Amino acid sequence: MSLLIKNGKICINGVITNKNIFIQENKITKLTNHEIKSDKTIDAKNKIIIPGLIDSHVHFREPGLTQKEDFLTGSMAAAAGGITTILDMPNTIPATTNLERLDEKRRLAKKSLVNYGFHFGSTDDNIAEIKKAKNIASVKVYLDSTTGNLMLEKENTIKNIFLNSEMVAVHAENENVQKTIELTKQSNNKLYLCHISSKEELDYIKKGKNNRIFAEVTPHHLFLTAKDLNELQSFAEMKPGLKTKEDQDALWKAISDGTIDTIATDHAPHLKEEKLEINYPFGVPGCETLLPLLLNAMQQNKITLKKITQLCCENPAKIFKIKNKGLIKEGYDADLTIIDLNLEKEVKNDELFTKCKWSPYNTWNLKGWPVTTIVNGNIVFENGKINKIAAKEVDYNE
């Protein structure tokens, strides 16, 4: 099937230009000023087309925790949020820490409506499995407590993982950020620092950053602070926790000065009833609200569209070496998001696609929303409706 997106403005390297996009067999085949005959046409007048977002940090909860989310519902939420590719974390039940479980997750993910890849879990005794794991985004190392029981404490194990992994993604807080930077400098790997949340952590990164070290920030640390706990209570509890306004301001500054490389959701859904328990779990959903929050912030001059596409499309593809994604370019996969900067609406819990059916941003009025999401040339989300067309696992560049 061929598809033409016409009359829209397209965002290439942050520059807005008037071009039509012709898509054939899942690929962007032509960027042109002409109208090419196609099987289907989308009129994107008054709208902007950006590369589909790549969310490099999600917890779609399958296997073992599917009351909270699964690959179908999580991918529906992602598509509704303009996300066309996700990288799923390993702390499921059982955790993705050996090849058999990785294969099982690959089978389960086949129902996903957005493209997918996997982070592989590390334990104190799975180095042989880590060495054998192929086509993964990273090896995930937990140095601070979070959902699941994958936290590592043995120094030798941690060093060994760093020496035997091309890319290590870490949950490291406070001084553990500095520790992982030192370990990366002693080995030859790349380091991806997940959900940086404080000024202190940013200081460590600024001192130690090189071209093998990358830092991620989440929307909840950009848009909520510890003060929001008064109202939201457990519904704003996650790991790492919300910080001060000073920390939040430092994160925004780090986005503009290039210290932060990606924005990813850390989409970590739990059911409302679980969040109301005395021993509630930590984590918040985020796939559906990431792009609207950023587009709204853009219209308040906090961030540019160029920066949004760099941090949410281009950089994740580069960092994790995801093939043919992250740019609007001839020959690249037709993963595209059409946004309407004039569309203003309220976030409503009951309209969300995520299985948990709540958001910490419920009732927030946001201006700028994705209206159409195209995955591999297929229209998966359009005007509030989902089309269930299965996507595929990502390929990685050598």
Regions found by a protein language model. Name each.
Residues K47-K110:
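Metal-associated gating/positioning segment near the N- to mid-region
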